[in-house]
């Protein structure tokens, strides 16, 4: 991956990139650049479903207090939650047509809803999706 990613104007975060960022996994430095961009001029979003994933995964790794702090930091950084009321039909369409994991379907739905680029990790649920712009921050799973 490039040291300096080209940051789109609108970024939708899947859970994996944010878990990598907050848990200092490989690629966290790349995600930091995306978060910094959202704190600047870029628009950042996360599906409510993916936010729940971030919270419970960080909680399992670092505890409840840290997980709640992560959710607060995301809100303060300007990453806006996209609620399921806005995206459930889009997520259902992605799930029906491509069978990604449900969390990935909601991430795709959020990206379609805000016309943004979905930032994902190494999982292959989005590999053949062309209806939404997708950027991978890493190619190897952790």
Q: Language-model features: where?
A:
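Alpha-helix capping/helix-boundary segments
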Residues: 17, 50, 86-87, 106-107, ...
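Short beta-strand scaffold positions
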Residues: 13, 45-46, 82, 102, ...
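A general alpha-helix detector
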Residues: 53-54, 73, 90
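Short glycine/serine- and small hydrophobic-enriched flexible loop segments
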Residues: 56-59, 112
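Active-site neighborhoods of divalent-metal-dependent phosphate/nucleic-acid chemistry enzymes
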Residues: 80-118
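Acidic, PIN/NYN-like endoribonuclease modules and their adjacent C-terminal/linker elements
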Residues: 1-5, 10, 80, 108, ...
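Short, well-structured N-terminal submotif of metal-dependent ribonuclease cores
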Residues: 1-46, 59-69
